């Protein structure tokens, strides 16, 4: 599985999937040139408070 998939599944298991996708959109706006995998990792960290 890809890293993005793992992050989405983990967020889903913690009931944070929708919040993850909302945060991904925010991070994309703030950092439009950041690689997608990094965007998801940053959003996951923000949502899960890690």
PLM regions: where:
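C-terminal alpha-helical interaction appendages
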Residues: 1-50
């Amino acid at each position: 599985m890809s890293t993005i998939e793992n992050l989405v599944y983990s967020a889903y298991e913690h009931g944070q999937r929708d919040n993850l996708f909302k945060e991904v959109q925010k991070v994309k706006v703030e950092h439009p040139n950041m690689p997608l995998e990094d965007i998801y990792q940053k959003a996951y960290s923000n949502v899960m408070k890690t």
